Amino acid sequence: MWLDWLEAQSGGPALRVLALASQKGGSGKTTLSGHLAVQAQRAGAGPVVLIDIDPQGSLADWWNEREAELPAFAQTTVARLANDLAVLRQQGFKLAVLDTPPAITMAIQSVISVAELIVVPTRPSPHDLRAVGATVDLCERAGKPLIFVVNAATPKAKITSEAAVALSQHGTVAPITLHHRTDFAASMIDGRTVMEVDPESRSAAEVTALWKYIADRLEKNFRRTVFAAPNTQAAQPGAYRPAGGFGRRVAQ
């Protein structure tokens, strides 16, 4: 009932937009994007759609290996992103998960501008910690909330806790740490996730807990957005539909 009222105030069904961004390459954005989208779908937050803004197309390659149709995949461009999100909202999608390229580019700025929440995966290393500043600056300038996720951490290593403390000086740190295990990469080979390969694994438990935390933050942010700006602009008639719809495609 409460969510129905909020959606009515916002002009229709809500589409939450979650973006993963990091200046540092190799932070685990693509792996985490796929895992969060799948877990969100499994947890009932769907239908979920994945959007790959990274020109490397790694997320598209992974999705094309999947047997499950959901989460869906939408092909778009930075220039079309805002309008396509409006179309996806009209088509009934509830969550969009966006993967972005490394380095600070116009693409990342555009994604942050339309995202409701930005997740910044960060490995617990000095070089990775130093690289978060540019992403933080972009989020602050856009007035968008961010969450750091300590990723690929060594279990019980001192540097893991030190990284969380250092990141907390710049923003909120998720209370769930993702640890380095081979099952994350192994599960991605054939288009799956650790939750689908071994639901009882520690890695699956971490992703499940992380999504639950992020979902709670998305809900709170959505409520604030509705009360701050109750009348959002609807999609324009005849808006562009992403090329190829939401079926499979061969990534170039």
Q: Where is each model-derived feature located?
A:
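Conserved Switch II/interswitch segment of TRAFAC-class P-loop GTPases
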Residues: 112-132, 154-156
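Conserved C-terminal guanine-recognition region of P-loop GTPase G domains, centered on the G4
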Residues: 129-151
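C-terminal boundary of histidine-terminating zinc-finger modules
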Residues: 188-209
